[in-house]
């Protein structure tokens, strides 16, 4: 996912790219928005820009190994957190967000990615 693939949000995309280019990236980012706003896509595009080996013109290249791994949601530095529902589990059995990642990746691939 590249910034160019996201419709609108030009000021925000430019701000995110400039912060990376200036070396001013905070230790954490929280992306939040209403359904249909493109929040997940924007967050993934930002991570891809951070990790890209060949950034150019305010966007990731989309072709280097890091870009390809992030586009497939398989990069080791990309961590997704999912809300969990503890109902249905045995008491004392911990529910972990990362248990849902294989299902999310399969659903993502099944629906053709972005």
State what each model feature region is.
Residues 2-114:
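Clamp-loader machinery-focused feature within the broader ASCE/P-loop NTPase space
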């Amino acid at each position: 996912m590249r910034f160019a693939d996201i419709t609108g949000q030009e000021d925000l995309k430019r701000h995110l790219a400039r912060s990376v280019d200036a070396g001013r990236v905070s230790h954490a980012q929280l992306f939040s928005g209403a359904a249909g706003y493109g929040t997940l896509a924007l967050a993934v595009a930002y991570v891809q820009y951070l990790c890209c080996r060949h950034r150019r013109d305010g966007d990731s290249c989309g072709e280097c190994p890091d870009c390809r791994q992030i586009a497939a949601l398989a990069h080791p530095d990309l961590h997704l957190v999912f809300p969990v529902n503890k109902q249905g589990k045995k008491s004392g059995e911990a529910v972990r967000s990362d248990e849902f990642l294989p299902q999310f990746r399969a659903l993502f691939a099944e629906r053709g990615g972005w």
